[in-house]
């Protein structure tokens, strides 16, 4: 069975949080570990640290990007996407700016896409309008980033690209570029397929405010690197409902604590299907909705928040431990990233050479 290639990645703009974990990291961990009936790994997974793309709206803050790359590498190590043990399943993690072929591919692709087509991308369109509304302007690099993403995908001839619903137009544009190039020159490039999560709740995790998508900039995120004290404080800030008495019926809708219980239940079903909370949670919900009787402990908000803290902390404890281990072996991890980046460079340069040959740009050495 021929392995399929997966390309995914993150913009290094800060530490990763639970939104990243449930929205993409779990999927990556599963993909890199998946084996076929012959016990062979099914996928070669490439994870790109998209530092060049991060600069499209952070050009004045390049030091922020540099620092965030280091944080991102530690986060990847802490969840098992990077390993110093060659016998363990892991992904190929590389830094975008070190793959020079990507910039050259982007330049060629720009000649195959019209301005109006790029501006039809809903993400580009909405961001452009938002910047205008704020009295600012959008860098051309931001407008052109879907073409850069097409270069990333095609350089590694990715069969699958995990994306959220909002990134589907990017896959569509990539395949349009592939078709245009193959029809204009020679069939060198490969069409790709979007791999989307089936659970909308996981792909757009709400923050601790229960209202907006989890984000560092909105100050509503639970980071994978949060200490127990930080986590405890954030869980205690979560809203429940407006009941004034324990005996009054509570509501689940808009209740951030129960929202996170439901999210964490997805993790439990994946990795701890016999966890006691999976059995107890329906009872807690029923008592909460019906109103606690005789001051039942598990109908109290404080009890529920304590249990939620314990559950999220159970997820984060091994991640924190691996992160500390990563700090102690950071030089070896950086060497691993350098090795992976060189490997990625070879693949991208091979694709670039094929593309230039198809275009007639494979000039002899003068």
Regions found by a protein language model. Give the residues of each.
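N-terminal Rossmann-like or analogous alpha/beta NTP/dinucleotide-binding catalytic cores
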Residues: 2-150, 268, 314, 320, ...
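Short coil/turn segments at secondary-structure junctions
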Residues: 12, 56, 60, 161, ...
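Structured ligand/cofactor/substrate-binding pocket environments in proteins
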Residues: 16-25, 44-46, 51, 60-72, ...
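Functionally constrained cores in energy, signaling, and assembly domains
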Residues: 10, 28, 45, 75, ...
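Eukaryotic N-terminal low-complexity, Ser/Thr- and Lys/Arg-rich leader segments
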Residues: 1-2, 366
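A short secondary-structure junction signal
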Residues: 120-123, 158, 216-217
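Conserved nucleotide- and phosphate/pyrophosphate-binding catalytic cores
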Residues: 20, 169, 175-366
């Amino acid at each position: 069975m021929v392995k399929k290639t997966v390309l995914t990645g993150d913009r290094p703009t800060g530490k990763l949080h639970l939104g990243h974990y449930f929205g993409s990291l779990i999927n990556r961990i599963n993909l890199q570990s998946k084996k076929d009936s012959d016990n062979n790994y099914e996928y070669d997974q490439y994870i790109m640290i998209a530092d060049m793309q991060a600069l499209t709206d952070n050009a004045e803050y390049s030091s922020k990007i540099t620092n965030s790359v280091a944080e991102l590498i530690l986060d990847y190590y802490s969840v098992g996407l990077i390993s110093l043990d060659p016998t363990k399943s892991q992904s190929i993690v590389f830094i975008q700016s070190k793959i020079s072929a990507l910039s050259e591919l982007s330049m060629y692709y720009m000649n195959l896409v019209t301005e109006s087509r790029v501006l039809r991308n809903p993400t580009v369109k909405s961001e452009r309008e938002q910047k205008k509304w704020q009295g600012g302007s959008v860098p051309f690099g931001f407008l052109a980033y879907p073409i850069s993403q097409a270069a990333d995908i095609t350089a590694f001839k990715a069969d699958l690209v995990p994306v959220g619903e909002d990134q589907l137009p990017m896959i569509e544009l990539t395949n349009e570029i592939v078709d245009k190039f193959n029809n204009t020159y020679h069939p060198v490039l490969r069409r790709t397929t979007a791999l989307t999560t089936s659970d909308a709740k996981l792909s757009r995790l709400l923050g601790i405010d229960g209202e907006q998508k989890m984000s560092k900039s909105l100050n509503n995120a639970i980071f994978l690197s949060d200490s127990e004290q930080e986590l405890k404080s954030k869980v205690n800030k979560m809203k429940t409902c407006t009941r004034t008495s324990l005996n009054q019926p509570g509501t689940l809708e808009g209740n951030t604590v129960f929202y996170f219980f439901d999210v964490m239940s997805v993790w439990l079903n994946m990795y701890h299907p016999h966890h006691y909370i999976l059995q107890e949670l329906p009872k807690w919900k029923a008592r909460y909705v019906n109103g606690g009787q005789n001051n039942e402990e598990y109908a109290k908000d404080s009890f529920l928040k304590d249990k939620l803290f314990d559950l999220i902390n159970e997820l984060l404890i091994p991640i924190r431990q691996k992160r500390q281990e990563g700090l102690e072996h950071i030089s070896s991890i950086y060497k691993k990233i350098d090795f992976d980046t060189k490997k990625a460079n070879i693949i991208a340069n091979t694709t670039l050479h094929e593309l230039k040959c198809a275009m007639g740009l494979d000039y002899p050495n003068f």
